[in-house]
Amino acid sequence: MAGHSKWANIKHKKAAADAKRGKIWTRLIKEIQVAARLGGGDANSNPRLRLAVDKAADANMPKDNVKRAIDRGVGGADGANYEEIRYEGYGIGGAAIIVDTLTDNRTRTVAEVRHAFSKFGGNMGTDGSVAFMFDHVGQFLFAPGTSEDALMEAALEAGANDVNTNDDGSIEVLCDWQEFSKVKDALEAGGFKAELAEVTMKPQNEIEFTGEDAVKMQKLLDALENLDDVQDVYTNAVVIEE
């Protein structure tokens, strides 16, 4: 993608995630509990649980922690009171932001999300105000130097919808979000290990921010990410570090 390095952004994202591993584990435990409660404790027949368990493995969460979270979810001891709520809003320059939460107190969560938006130059929107600007997809990113032809053949055979080579040489593979685990398994069986593999809300268009605007936007995104009830934050803003 012209103007910025998607590969650099992904490396930054991974480094930031590693720095917040304890917080990531907390979020994953909540997601595993809710997924198990809603769809049962067998990851083979529960796609949402499979995704959460795979994420836990990628985050190096001990298997005992995962099993306990599944057991609690199935048993209803925890997770039963968590409610999924999506908030939508805008950052500076009209950048679109989606905030997905799991909460046991809707009043607390909406107040915290609204406060973060307003404190850092954004504002809350109504349901559906920005979600149409994103596609719910499975996304894989492979390092520069990966064989494009071989990856494209394997990806399309696995059921992927699109394979794109970015300006920095990294390769992006997209699939229907429901097919994510199947495509991931097939690619790994073919020897292709993605640096990033996730189900995400991918923006249809991106807005680049530099300088002071980039700093402001990053502060807003960090404030939202750091809220305890927040599971994921998606945006069409691309923060360019100078």
Swiss-Prot record:
One GO cellular component term? cytosol
In which domain of life is the source organism classified?
A: Bacteria
Record keyword Lyase present = no
Task: Please name one Pfam family that this protein belongs to.
Answer: Transcrip_reg
Annotated InterPro entries: Integrase-like_N, TACO1_YebC-like_2nd/3rd_dom, TACO1_YebC_N, Transcrip_reg_TACO1-like, Transcrip_reg_TACO1-like_dom3, YebC-like
Locations listed in the record: Cytoplasm
- Gene Ontology terms describing biological process: regulation of DNA-templated transcription
Sorted UniProt keywords: Cytoplasm, DNA-binding, Transcription, Transcription regulation
Asked if Metal-binding is a keyword of the record, the answer is no
Question: What GO annotations for molecular function exist for this entry?
Answer: DNA binding
What PANTHER family does the entry give?
TRANSCRIPTIONAL REGULATORY PROTEIN YEBC-RELATED, TRANSLATIONAL ACTIVATOR OF CYTOCHROME C OXIDASE 1
Family membership noted in the UniProt record: Belongs to the TACO1 family.
- Name the HAMAP family for this protein: Transcrip_reg_TACO1
Q: What is this protein called?
A: Probable transcriptional regulatory protein BTH_I1015
Q: What species is this protein from?
A: Burkholderia thailandensis (strain ATCC 700388 / DSM 13276 / CCUG 48851 / CIP 106301 / E264)
